[in-house]
Amino acid sequence: MAKSRPHIILSAAVSIDGKIATHLGESNLSSKMDLIRLHQLRRVVDAILVGKNTINVDDPLLTVRHAKGKNPIRIILDSSGTISANSKIVKTANKISTILVVAERAPRNISKLGKKGVEIIRCGRDKIDLKKLLNILQKRGISKILLEGGGITNWYFLKEKLVDELILTVTPYILGSKDAISLVQGEGFGKISKSPSFKLKKIERMKNEIVLYYAS
């Protein structure tokens, strides 16, 4: 039986102590080799998905630059519709397909982003309904999504058991701090028996980094 949602791959670069960003928000952990690997992955998926914090803090383009290939659709989850119109992703929305997903309660004036080329999908009353959203995306022909965080967005997908693959690049840094951003934020699982479990499929060494490939 075919899945009613796209295949989800969560990919992230983490420090030795499991952080994806410092307490000041710096997140450029990957080496050039790992960026090439990531961009090779980006070019074979239908869409890249991130949360609003990733846009607000990192202001990424989410394009394919370190490898040859087409740019995937860019999807941003932002329940309240607070993404900045001056972000790189909005400024390039007329050239690269970009979807902003908001909750029904989001203000109507976010429609102005539509004039900049951003498609807006309302999904869920007070917060975004992930399962409903993925069903919508599947019907639109989006069958493979690369989830690139951040920690809160990763949590919601893992909580709903919506992650099929996990690719982690362990970088040679230790960031420390209780305020640094972990791979998975949110409320967390109180019991190990309730948490999702993954099978380690492959280990790849790239000089001073290790890439771990897991499947659900």
Question: Predicted regions span which residues?
Answer:
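Enzymes that bind and transform nitrogen-containing heteroaromatic metabolites
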Residues: 1-216
